[in-house]
Amino acid sequence: MQNTAKKILIADSNDAFRGSLRAFIQEMGHEVFEAATGQEAIEKACSIHPQLIMMDVRLAGMTGDEVTARLKRNQSTRNIPVVINAAWTMACNVEERIHRALNAGAEEILYKPFHLPMLRAVLRTYLLA
């Protein structure tokens, strides 16, 4: 089976996290683009048309849910799968978090820190579709 490189946009305000995720995805053979703010994520998604967006819940300027909802309303980006990344905390209301992400149009939600085999499986699911 031939592995063709896909374009993935990582939208996260944490430089260190973006760097770690970028390295992991590049190791899988894919091309990575990055955005640190909600507006930057929208602009890059519209210009590069990635095959997948890894979207943090909290971005400067707007939430990941708001960015996702805007992308899903846009004709040119509505079919790009979005995986919401949320930090796992004991104070987190898991059901509410999942509900908000899915209502915004996200296909999936992953909690940080990622379990790497799960992250790899999610990436493969959306990149092979």
At which residue positions do the language-model features occur?
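Alpha4 helix (beta4-alpha4-beta5 surface) of REC/receiver domains from two-component response regulators
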Residues: E66, T89-E108, A121
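Hydrophobic/aromatic residues positioned on beta-strands within the core alpha/beta folds
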Residues: N85-A86
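Two-component/phosphorelay signaling modules centered on CheY-like receiver
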Residues: D15-F33, Y126
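Acidic catalytic/metal-coordinating carboxylates
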Residues: T37-E40, T63-A69
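C-terminal output helix
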Residues: Y111-L123
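Active-site beta3 strand of CheY-like receiver
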Residues: I48-M54, L59
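Residue-level signal for the "D+5" position in two-component response regulator receiver
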Residues: E34, L59-M62
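The feature encodes the CheY-like receiver
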Residues: A60, A69, R78, M90
